[in-house]
């Protein structure tokens, strides 16, 4: 018991930063080189902090998995989920009602992976991604949220209320310069776009939101709202 108590109270070095695990019960498995934590688990690594009800730390790859109402916070990044795995490079894999905030970006889905070093993330299962002024929903979203570049596939919708723009397609790629209102969307497969009440349908559309300019690809239909 004395050795276990010392283990609970002591931080150990992991690469360039220290990792500390605190819990009601900690068990070290020398054969598997893991530490299992149960009850009011708190894991800190550098500036990051995770809390949950049960956790497992793997010394081999320096990864930590927490489950049970998990909360993760690191600076301007926060995440809640049923289960979260944090890796040595600070990347995250979360599942179960995941909601994440990174600065002014919001991500939601059944599962989310995120890499803070370059802002790359994936969202699966009722995927939702919001960046300033624009929202995307899809079955799957792949994005670089720092530079605002996202690709949605599977029943995708995109909206920009300030530009009175809404669209749906099988796949949508959207890019925007951070801090600028220069959104550009490429819609492919059953593309449908509405801006200021005017509707365009076609196999593919390219939309520059601020200029309210649309280029069609293939045979398309434009429906102009009455009075315009």
Language-model features, listed with the residues they occupy:
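Mature-chain termini and adjacent capping regions
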Residues: 1-228
